[in-house]
Amino acid sequence: MKSSHTSLICILMLSLVALHQCVRMKVKEIGRSNKIYIPPCFRDSCDHVLKKDCYCCGSKPDLCWEDQHYCNTHCPPLKPLIN
């Protein structure tokens, strides 16, 4: 019985610390934390004989490159869908 009480007290203390941290967050931090980053390129399989994997633009899937960094720098960013 004593160990279960100790466990509950520990869980309660950890919950209070987490709640305290959430209250201390600024509005700017909360707005920034709910954004999802979608990279401009995705990995795909290519029809090339020597190289099976390539990286294609999400906005223009017909544009594909062998190097992911090159693809990320040359692809236009994806436009978010807003309803």
Swiss-Prot record:
Record has Disulfide bond as a keyword: yes
Tissue: Expressed exclusively in ovule embryo sacs and in early developing endosperms.
Family of the protein in this entry: Belongs to the MEG family.
GO biological process, any: suspensor development
Signal sequence region: 1-22
UniProt keyword Signal, yes or no: yes
Gene ablation phenotype (knockout): No visible phenotype, due to redundancy with ESF1.2 and ESF1.3. Simultaneous down-regulation of all 3 genes by RNAi induces embryo abnormalities.
Protein name, as recorded: EMBRYO SURROUNDING FACTOR 1.1
Chain coiled-coil ranges: none
Disulphide bond pairs: C41-C56, C46-C75, C54-C71, C57-C64
Function: Maternally-contributed central cell peptide regulating suspensor development and correct auxin distribution in early developing embryos.
Keywords associated with the record: Developmental protein, Disulfide bond, Signal
A Pfam family assignment: ESF1
